[in-house]
């Protein structure tokens, strides 16, 4: 019950690690996040510090070659590229309950023919759990279990959210939406702003997202209320036995006045959306993704990261987590 509450209280926020940057609010250190995750979830040596529970997959990506007006990146050339990825549960618990009200994660590494790598790290929530690293760290610290009861202080968390309203939107979304019934029945959102450049150097701010061609489907209330159990990996294998699992890759275009650097705010529903390609997952077994850290700041040529402080702080913490994992910490 403790892990299930923490997952609901923090939602997808617990899925994200950080990269230290001069832009990071109040000079928050990525080490603080790694240490705080351990205080919440405990030490799990050799495991990822975020998204500890998950399963690898392999497949391919093909971008839409008709978007030259927006991007000259080879990612969108129309060429088919190999992909290694990972579906996951957020947080640092490798035994997280799969029927709890927490999002799913989708991460992928695409190998381009010119040698470029493109990483994606997405969640099944359209907003992040805080507007900047300092606000998010405070939420985490407010959620550390009490040393006597072993449970989080609900009043403390509620008071923090009231004082920091940017932390409430994601929690509200998770409380209202049924958890995805499978990894293939969820939409996934990149949350952060990136910039595309065309051949003339003109830039366009975008957020990316994935739409499942199998459709969106949530768990039933009885499934959510059932005792914690595992089913996501088995459902994925069963689905792939029938053929590739496909996701439509979309680019949401920013317009004037959009919050480019605050992932806790959704963009307007009437935003222009481009069909940018397709992710096709063909197999899910093995450990091909084990040594990939899926840093979302690893980008193909023609694509650049924004100054979103949460995006910018992710690389360093991903690297710290990766180093700890490889050394059995």
For the regions a protein language model found, what residue spans apply to each?
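Bacterial N-terminal signal peptides that target proteins for export
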Residues: 1-8
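Bacterial N-terminal signal peptides
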Residues: 9-17
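Sec/Tat signal peptide C-region and signal peptidase I cleavage site
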Residues: 18-24
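Active-site-adjacent core segments of small-molecule enzymes
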Residues: 25-329
């Amino acid at each position: 019950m403790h892990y299930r509450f923490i997952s609901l209280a923090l939602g997808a926020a617990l899925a994200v690690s950080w990269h230290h940057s001069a832009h990071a609010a109040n000079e928050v250190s990525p080490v603080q996040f790694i240490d705080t995750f351990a205080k919440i979830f405990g030490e799990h040596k050799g495991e990822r510090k975020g998204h500890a529970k998950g399963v690898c997959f392999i497949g391919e990506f093909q971008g839409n070659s008709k978007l030259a007006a927006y991007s000259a990146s080879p990612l969108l050339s129309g060429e088919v590229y190999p992909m290694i990825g990972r579906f996951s549960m957020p947080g640092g618990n490798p035994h997280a309950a799969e029927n709890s009200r927490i999002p799913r994660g989708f991460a992928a590494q695409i190998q381009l023919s010119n040698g470029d790598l493109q990483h994606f790290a997405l969640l099944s929530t359209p907003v992040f759990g805080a507007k900047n690293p300092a606000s998010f760290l405070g939420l985490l610290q407010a959620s550390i279990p009490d040393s006597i009861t072993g449970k989080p202080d609900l009043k403390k968390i509620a008071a923090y959210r009231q004082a920091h309203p940017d932390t409430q939107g994601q929690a509200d979304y998770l409380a209202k939406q049924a958890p995805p019934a499978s990894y293939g029945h969820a939409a996934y959102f990149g949350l952060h702003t990136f910039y595309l450049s065309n051949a003339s150097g003109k830039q366009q701010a975008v957020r990316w997202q994935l739409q499942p061609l199998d459709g969106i489907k949530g768990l039933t209330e009885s499934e959510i209320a059932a005792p914690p159990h595992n089913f996501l990996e088995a459902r994925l294998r069963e689905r792939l036995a029938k053929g590739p699992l496909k996701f439509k890759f979309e680019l949401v275009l920013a317009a004037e006045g959009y919050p480019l650097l605050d992932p806790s705010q959704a963009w307007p529903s009437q935003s222009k959306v481009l069909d940018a390609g397709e992710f096709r997952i063909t197999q899910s077994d093995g450990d091909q993704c084990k040594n990939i850290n899926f840093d979302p700041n690893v980008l193909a040529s023609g694509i650049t990261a924004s100054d979103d402080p949460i995006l910018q702080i992710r690389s360093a913490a991903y690297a710290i987590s990766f180093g700890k994992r490889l050394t059995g910490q």
